[in-house]
Structure formats: C-alpha cells, structure tokens
Amino acid sequence: MASEHIEHKLALLPDKPGCYQMKNLNSQIIYVGKAKNLKNRVRSYFKSSHEGKTAKLVSEIADFDYIVTSSDKEAFLLEITLIQKFQPYYNIKLKKGTGYPYIKITNEKDPRMEIVSSVRRDGGFYFGPYPNVYAAEETLHFLEKVYPLRRCNGFQGRPCLYYHMGQCLGACFQEVPKEEYDQQIAKIKSFLRGNVAKIKQSLQTKMQKASEAMEFERAADIRDQIHYIEVTVEKQKIISNDSTPRDLFNFYLDKGWLSIQIFFIRQSRLIKREKRLFPIATDVNDELSSFILQFYNNKNKVLPNEILVPSGLDNKIMAEILGVPVRTPQRGEKKNLLELAKENAQITLEEKFRLMELDESKTTGAMKEITDALGIPEGHRIEAFDHSHIQGSELVSAMVVFTDGKPDKKMYRKFKLNTVDHADEAASTREVIRRRYVRLLKEKQSLPDLILMDGGDIQLNAAKDVLVNELSLHIPVAGMVKNDKHKTSDLIFGSQDQRVQLDPKSQGFYLVQRIQDEVHRFAITFHRQLHAKNSLASQLDLIQGVGPKTRNKLLKSFGSLNKIRDANLKEIEELGIPEKVAKTIKVSLSVHGK
C-alpha cells in the first residue's frame, strides 16, 4: 500500500508526457521510466497488483519525482539521458565499450583503409560491424590486395614497398588522380555490399594466366584470395533478396525475464547476432524501446538504412530520434526474419531457465537435500571447520562458509590456536567453536543454520558441548566422515551420533563433498603459509645482531629469504640496519643458501 506521502503526490500528477524516477528509502533513483501520460503510468505502480521483479521494485519505492516534457519524443530522449546518468538498479543498462570493428575508408586527398572500433562524423565511409577483429582484418587484407588505395604514409619521394607489391596506388611518389581513387572506392563498396561475382571471375582468369606463365607463387596468392571469397562471402546464407543494410530486434518474455535478439544484416546476409537477457520490472515494449535507443547511443555505431522491430513500439518516435526508418513488417521475408529472431530469443531464454534450474539443484536444492536428510528446518548458511598441524606443533583451524550452496569467501576465517599446544582434536574444536560463536553473540551477528565438523564423533561432541553447555546455543552440528580411501562417506548427527547416508549421486552429497574439500584446502593452505613464515623468522633469528625489530623489517620489506639474499647491502641498510649487521645477514644467508 502506498504511503500517505505518495498518495498525495499521486493526486497531483499531470495528464502529460514525461519521465518519472522511482526512489528508495535512501533517496537513490532505482528506476527511470517514460510515459505518454504520467498520471496513468505512475499511478499504475501503486493501484495494481504486480508479480516478480515489478513487485520487488514497488516494494522498494519510498518516493518518486517526475519531469514533464512537451512531447513523447522528448520523453524518450530524456529517459535515455537519465538512465545513463543515474544507472538505476531496475533499468536495463548496456555496458560501454562493447562495440565491434568497422572498416573505414578515410576522407583524405589520398584515402586509405583501416580498421576502427568507433564511428565518427568525419566524412569517411564505414562498413560493418564485423563479428570480431579477425574477420575485419581478413577482409581488409583482401581489399588491400585486390582494390589498393594508399598503404604508405603519403608522399616520400620514392615508391614504397606496398607499391612494388601492387597494394598501393603510389601516393608515396606521384600524384594519384582523384578519378582513380573514386573508381577503386566504388569497387570496394560494391564488393562490401555483396557483389562478388565479377571479382571472382577476374581473379580466376588472373590465376589461370599466372599458372600458364609458371608464376606459381602469384597463382597461389590469387588462389587464397578466391578461397577467401568462397568461405567468407559466398558461404554465408543469403537471407534477404535485397542488399539494404538493416538491423532487426525481437524478443521473448517469460517469468519476468526478457530475451532480446539483434540480427545484423549486411550484403543480404546475417553477419552477426547478439543476444541479451534481462530481468524486467515494467512494460516490455517500454523496456525494448529503451534498449534500442541505448544500443545505438552507447555503441556510437553506423546506423543501418532500416531497423525492423516487433509491433507495439512507437516506431515513429524512435525513427525521429535515430534518423532512420523503424518499421514493423506485416508479411513476407522481413516478417519471417522477425519470427526467426523471436524463435532464437525463446531458445536462449529457455536455455537460461534450464541453467538456472541446474544451478538451483546444485545450490539451494543441494542444501535442502542435506537439511531433509538430517531432519532439520531448511536453512541458508553452513559453517564448516577443520584443523591442521605438523606433528602437534603450529596448530591452526580454518572455517569456510557456504550460503545457499555457494562458497562465501568473504566470510572465511582463520584461527591460530592459543590454548592448545599439542595435537588434541577435542581441545582444538572447543577453542575454535568458542571463539567463533562468542564473537557472533557479542556482535549480535546472525548464526549459521548448520555447522559441519571435518571429522568424527570427537570433533562433533566437542562442538556440541561448547555450543549447548557453555553458550546455550542449539545450532545443528554434524560431522563429515571419510571412508578408508579418505573420500567423503557419510554424515554423523544426533544425540547418538547416528550415521546419515546421502545418495552418492545426489547434489546434497556433492555439496558435502565440496565443503569438506574446501575447508581442508583452506586449513592446509593457512598452515603452510604460517609454517613458511615461522621458518623464515626462525632462520633470521639465528643470525647474530638480528633481533625481533630487524627481523620484522626484513620480513615486511622482502618477504622471503631468497629476496633478502638477492638484495644488495645498500637496500638492506636503507631499512635502518647498521652496515655491520647488514654484512652479517648477507654472509649468513649466502652460506645458508649454499
């Protein structure tokens, strides 16, 4: 239900076009939308029932603002500006820097071809986009051999290497007539638009003549050029009977997710397909319109001659903003292309859902399998503990956290044991459990739903003893037991330490296995780090003149014996260490190294 403050603002909304900004309790803009009628659109958020992401959006709205515009077109433009400025959480946002390469013919006296990643209004001719840099480079290399322009830096008084190779018209040493450039550029444009039959026939004739003249290297080069045409141009499926450059957008919506497909059609061929997936909160037509305008604004790309979209969008306004026709075909080839894009969008979204289901079975589903097997309420967080030591010395413990079946590494913790000086699993468990949960209680932090101990009944009962008898906590605790091959086997749980078997092929079993492996890895890694540090410190302590302060300076600055050994005297003395002590360090470590 809307607050009294919002109800008052709703009553004042005008019947005019504009943009609205939804805000949360912190006055952050969480959604920007446009409306032909602000009063109707904004009121619909609070006067209708919603599901999914829209319901979540509405639940977070604490206030809203709006800006009236003079037309729908202005509202479109303002919406894009506001989205890019505030990056609201619930809006579809496109990442910058995701453009594709283009081939450019420069607008110069002696034009040249190059690959660029953005389009500028500089009078140049741009063709693309290409699916990747490799495809653009392959095309450029072909054009430079077959339709050369200028490859050198310009006039230098003598022919360049490329001129001798037939890949430059000679601006390096002579005046090249504009007509000659114009002819070449016309041929390049024709080729890029898909007219390849003439050049293929010409190349085949040249290859035949080169072979007859026994110029086999040249013939092989021409053969490669013909091969490029065959595999790169001719084998692309022709999907349109006209060569108009066009982009095509369509979508599929299901379960609050929007799947968008973009087809790039050039040279009567589908040269590139993009797909995007977004959870959406509002009207799909508004979201798609916003996406299309951001798409062209962010990519700073060459606009096609035509954009095809599904019905329901305001084509007229988008066409005015973009400066190219935006059309919805009703029949024929273009309509079929739109249907193809929609079919692809549906396939992409269904694949997304299947992956989400699989991920859920491995995470939250696996967590539920474990809690069901133990007969405890469903939960979200598991904390697992393991100990590590070397022959009873340098005792440490480690804790890993899994939330909804996924490792939460920022919650991992390491413990140097303070009250245990020998290998004692029960004492080690008591100390680490006591330290962990006393702290959580003092800081009033949330407790886990399940604790797993890597070990058997010794660790399990020690943990339960501290939790119940010292801290009055009743967190479920289970032990992770391994078989004789040191592989995850069962859980032990309950007052009688009963064995709880999980199906070895179940996701719950795999999750226990991952947790056990992860806590063991984390404990071993911590122990090795500590051992290496202690070993290094002890070796430095044996050097005459090196006390705790000097040792800590060396450790902090160099980090390892090898780095200290490789340092020169000056570097050691710069730490404030006397020359005599520095020399002793160098000599001692040198002897030790040998």
UniProtKB/Swiss-Prot annotation:
One of the GO BP terms on file: nucleotide-excision repair
InterPro entries: GIY-YIG_endonuc, GIY-YIG_endonuc_sf, GIY-YIG_UvrC_Cho, RuvA_2-like, UVR_dom, UVR_dom_sf, UvrABC_protein_C, UvrC
GO CC annotations on file: cytoplasm; excinuclease repair complex
Location of the GIY-YIG domain: 15-92
Alphabetical list of CDD domains matching this protein: GIY-YIG_UvrC_Cho
GO MF, any single term: DNA binding
Alphabetically ordered keywords of this record: Cytoplasm, DNA damage, DNA excision, DNA repair, Excision nuclease, SOS response
Subcellular location: Cytoplasm
Stored PROSITE patterns: GIY_YIG, UVR, UVRC
All residue ranges annotated as the UVR domain in the record: 197-232
Source taxon at top rank: Bacteria
Cited function: The UvrABC repair system catalyzes the recognition and processing of DNA lesions. UvrC both incises the 5' and 3' sides of the lesion. The N-terminal half is responsible for the 3' incision and the C-terminal half is responsible for the 5' incision.
HAMAP family: UvrC
Listed PANTHER family: UVRABC SYSTEM PROTEIN C, UVRC/OXIDOREDUCTASE
Family: Belongs to the UvrC family.
Quaternary structure, from the entry: Interacts with UvrB in an incision complex.
Protein name: UvrABC system protein C
Species this chain originates from: Pediococcus pentosaceus (strain ATCC 25745 / CCUG 21536 / LMG 10740 / 183-1w)
Gene assigned in the entry: uvrC
